[in-house]
Amino acid sequence: MSTNASGSPVLSLLIPIYNVQRYLRECLDSALAQTLKDIEIICINDGSTDNSPAIIREYMERDGRVKMIDKANSGYGDSMNHGLEMARGKYVGILESDDFMASDALENLSRPPIAIMPTLRRRT
């Protein structure tokens, strides 16, 4: 993973997870396919009883940017707090585990379009 001058990724992407094995691969594939590569992906497993933790471990073996917090079920807010504690990025984003992103989504968000339009006024 490339990092900025401080040694931290530009963006920490938090993914709260609870029993979403059906959607998780598509979600993680979209996170890893981002054109903005300077990210860390923090999966917060909130006590899933399905195959979600095994899927996360599989992705962790494939890509060092994927990390997991594995904790007892305590709800969404607690999951986000754990993720924020671990996040090292300058910015933090959230991707829900049953969603996916276009491959350029984070890059587009990191470089918002700026338009400058000069105004000329003629004095009479």
What does each of the following model-derived ranges do?
Residues M1-T124:
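Nucleotide-sugar donor-binding/catalytic module of glycosyltransferases
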